[in-house]
Amino acid sequence: MPSSSSSNSRPGVPPDVIAALEDALGRDRIERNEASCVFFSTDLSRSGVAAAAIARPGTTDEVGAILRICAQAQVSVVPRGGGFSYTGGYLPINESTIIVDLRDLNHVIEINTEDMYVVVEAGCTWERLYEALKSENVRTPYFGPMSGFGATVGGALSQGSFFLGSSQYGPVADSVLAVEIVLADGTTMRTGSWGGVDNASPFYRSYGPDMTGLFLGDTGALGFKTKAVLKLVPFPRHTQFLSFVFDREEAAVAAVSAVGRLGIAGECYCWDPYFVKVMAAQSTSLMQDLKLLAGVARGQKGSRGLFNAARLAIAGKSVFDGEVFMLNISIDDPTAEGANARQALLRDVLAGTDAREITPSAPMATRGTPFINFNTSERRTTMRNLPTNGLVPHSRLAALSRDIRLVLANRADDMARHGIECGVIYFGVGQQGACLEPLIYWDDPRHFQHDRVAEVSNIDALAGFDGPSETTEIAMQIRKELTAVMVRHGSAHVQIGKTYPWLATRTPPIAALIGAIKRHVDPDGRMNPGSLGLADLPV
């Protein structure tokens, strides 16, 4: 980490505010280096206005001190976790902004296997939480995104998230019992049964109005999460896997919904032919392959893990051959008989389709190594990817899929001319709906100058670029067109950030209510301004 320097001149925040923050946290906890401030003001989609400073608290009290100081000085504050936003979630919109890096609040505070909950700080990564719980033979129902090596609990709760465990248990919000929140004036509060005045326990969410839900998916616009209480389930004793391929997208989409409605699969996700080809062409070294097989063996106990690792090794990458859609399923159960019964039921459900069963290499590998460190030097390339997600009820998934394909077909010439590629993944999310997620890929040397390994931006190199390239602008326009189609189909979204039109698509009574709440908890509109569309509200 670059050294802190209060003498390093940065615009936007008066020196006495910086001095007060340094007094509250220590000088080494306030970063003003330009390369760091620009980096922390850039997410996976774009750059915001560079923050005046980065503050790194280590406790809830220190978060409260930051927010109090900034509120008194009319300075904006933006929370940041692992930095995996791709919708402008933590990007400042004005120079008078302090970014609050919450990753030092990273402790697993209590694992209560009697009452089946865990108390964890918001800056803890999903991988760290998973490993701590696994040692106690428990797990959270939803247990993280694939980016959970660096993505934090607080980031997922603020922006919304689904993947591991989500086909059976729903998105992350459905696994939350309570949260600890710091409001704009520095006040700390707790929700659910944890918010009682005497002998409070966080075991129950639904005591009175659901105050926990109010602060989930809020993008940090209503409060900064410092702790969360999540449900626990016994760590699955038995896991089975299935993979199928389809020639037709309509059949694959219908299969995602058929599996999702049953609610018996931990994960259910389908890759289109683009992603199947990516997996087939993936160039890995022998050492990386051995690590993957070791992960599969380690991820399941005893002979079952060794057997599945051997199956994966024998199948190799041949399972990724062909112009096909690939459906991948993980199945958890307390007993081998139960896991086998679930597996048999899913085979029966898909028997009447054009599904062809193949070796389940992909879901085995995912569960064997569930969290990937994306921020490594060997993964640093100029190739970017930008997801766009839309969650719809099962009854609307096929129509949304067709309209998304029309957008991509209409843009095919532009994409070919500029080297832009796009693949689509489908996810089952709970029993009521599914997600369609196109990912756009293109080459962007400018964005490469934001180094996610060193966590600094190359200021000199960035100065040599005259704004975003034409290719980047076209990619962003395609994303807007995809989003517009999703909105037309009534989609919900995770990672709302400053991209999806949440407020603009709410009915007037909801917009008025959220405006009143925002003005109560953040009367000056200084908490992550612009997120949720709340910058459009009068304060």
Predicted regions and their residues:
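Conserved oxyanion/phosphate-binding beta-strand-loop segments in alpha/beta enzyme cores
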Residues: 20-41
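Long, structured ligand/cofactor-binding scaffold of large enzymes
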Residues: 40-139, 151-162
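Charged, glycine/proline-rich intrinsically disordered loops and linkers
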Residues: 191-205, 279-319, 445-473
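Conserved glycine-rich FAD pyrophosphate-binding loop
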Residues: 2-11, 44-50, 75, 80-82, ...
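FAD-binding subdomain of flavoenzyme oxidoreductases
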Residues: 109-111, 122, 127-264, 268, ...
